[in-house]
Amino acid sequence: YKSGFMSTINFSKDGLILEKSDLTTPDAIKIHKNIKDSLESDAIYIAMEASSHGLEQDRLIGLDIDYAILTSFSHDHLDYHGDIQSYQSAKEKLFLDLNPKKNIVCIDSSFGKKLHSKLLKNNKETYSISIKENADFHASFEKSPIGLKVNLKAFEKNHTFELKTFSRYLASNIICSMAVLILEGVKLSEISKIAKDIVLPQGRLERIIKNQQVIYIDYAHTPEALECTLKELNNMHNEPIWCLFGCGGNRDKDKRPLMGKIAQKYSNHVVLTNDNPRDEDEMDIINDILSEIKEMEQISINLDRKDAIESSILEMERNHINGVLLIAGKGHENYQEVNDNLYELNDKNIINSL
């Protein structure tokens, strides 16, 4: 089936990327234009990300939504919403105010559990997904040569298949998409056949081998995402883990010390650097990250992200550290935002240029 797609990364029709995206959820006029363009190209399905900003600003008003999906919930955007309750209320608008025909909710977060119960109480057709407990769609994982071996149970039927990702976090999102296909009548056996051919987004626990050094690039920029990613790497590797990250300027400040503590807890060494400082003082951001860290022995600071990445790789090579480097926060992004200016910068390109 032909399809259209609007996301943090781009707007595409039938797999062809038409334009890059600055907003996770475009304004209402742009949304309807993209939908019109997709339909004129004979698209049958259109998928889009619904951000809390977009929901709060009613950018999705007027859409006829077949499936609303909650993949996860994490501490983010409190600079905009003010508190976690307001952030949750914005998310709930997709499910309670826009009246989708069917709801799919991952219940592996406390908010997911609460939302799932609320939807059922409101007699909304709702399905649960979990990688932790019993649910309508339940997935368990094992390591495989290409990534993860998945056992998916749906409506009393089990199927095993492989995914080309090492991330259970990302695999859970894929299961949410598969749930839509199953509810649309596609057989689980058919989905299993194509699972290993699924093309994953760039910068989502993307593995790179550089001079025998194992490096991962990941978009993790919230406490929950960083913790999930680091836990994943600790499960996958016995070697020392280095974590390089920063926090965005003029954004949710409350998450900074949380991310600092998480990075220290699950890493052997932490490199703090810039991640879109915007017009906020760079060292103020770093000091916020460090505010609840007691021991500084395993912490280093290099505000120049390009140099921080290059230096970390070279230092690990020079000192024969047979470890794993996680470069977190920017993922697919191709820029660094400083004082209202965008400078070209891509983590993967920096690695490949060495």
Q: Locations of the language-model features?
A:
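Short beta-strand-centered segment that lines the nucleotide-binding/catalytic pocket of NTP-utilizing
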Residues: Y1-K13
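Residue-level signal for inorganic ion chemistry
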Residues: M6, I31, E49, T71, ...
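A short acidic, helix-capping loop that chelates divalent metal ions and anchors anionic groups
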Residues: K13-E19, H75-H81, R251, N276-R278, ...
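Conserved nucleotide-sensing/catalytic segment adjacent to the nucleotide-binding pocket
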Residues: I17, S21-S51
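Acidic, Mg2+-coordinating active-site environments of NTP-dependent enzymes
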Residues: S41, I65-I215, L290-I299
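Conserved helix/coil segment N-terminal to the catalytic DExD/H
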Residues: H53-I61
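Inter-motif core of Ras-like GTPase G domains
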Residues: I61-S72, E239-C243
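ATP-dependent carboxylate-amine ligase
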Residues: N99, N123-E125, A179-L354
